[in-house]
């Protein structure tokens, strides 16, 4: 395995980690939108009182905090994965030359 292969492995691992982070965050909103209760609420939204459809600022703030924590957790995991591949590449580099 040459240095080009190790570099390609590191680049691919970064792209995979970034893709997983994006889809893991986006998947929660898609899952929430497809729940039967949410669909039923959307179908009967015409009959609902508008004041009940508003999300309180506390709920919105806690959702943002959870999303920020999730982003940080995924970023740390991605850095760990990339770090492991970088260490492997540096250890194998003298044998490849």
Swiss-Prot record:
Entry's Gene Ontology cellular component terms: extracellular region; host cell endoplasmic reticulum membrane; membrane
Record's subcellular location: Secreted; Host endoplasmic reticulum membrane
TM helices/strands, residue ranges: 69-89
Major localization class: secreted
Keywords recorded for this protein, A-Z: Host endoplasmic reticulum, Host membrane, Membrane, Secreted, Signal, Transmembrane, Transmembrane helix
Signal peptide segment: 1-21
Motif (RxLR-dEER): 32-60
Membrane topology field: Single-pass type I membrane protein
Subunit structure: Interacts with host transcription factor NAC069.
Comment field on protein domains: The RxLR-dEER motif acts to carry the protein into the host cell cytoplasm through binding to cell surface phosphatidylinositol-3-phosphate.
The protein's role, per its UniProt record: Secreted effector that inhibits stress-induced relocalization of the transcription factor NAC069 to the nucleus, thus affecting its broad role in abiotic and biotic stress responses.
Family in the record: Belongs to the RxLR effector family.
Official protein name in the record: Secreted RxLR effector protein BLR05
Source taxonomy: Eukaryota, Sar, Stramenopiles, Oomycota, Peronosporales
């Amino acid at each position: 395995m040459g240095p080009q292969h190790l570099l390609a492995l590191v680049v691919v691992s970064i792209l995979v980690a970034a893709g997983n982070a994006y889809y893991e965050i986006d998947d929660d909103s898609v899952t929430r939108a497809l729940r039967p209760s949410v669909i039923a609420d959307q179908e009967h939204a015409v009959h609902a009182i508008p004041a009940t459809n508003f999300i309180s600022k506390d709920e919105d703030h806690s959702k943002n905090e959870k999303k920020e924590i999730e982003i940080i957790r995924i970023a740390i995991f991605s850095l760990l994965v990339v770090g492991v591949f970088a260490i492997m590449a540096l250890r194998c580099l003298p044998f490849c030359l």
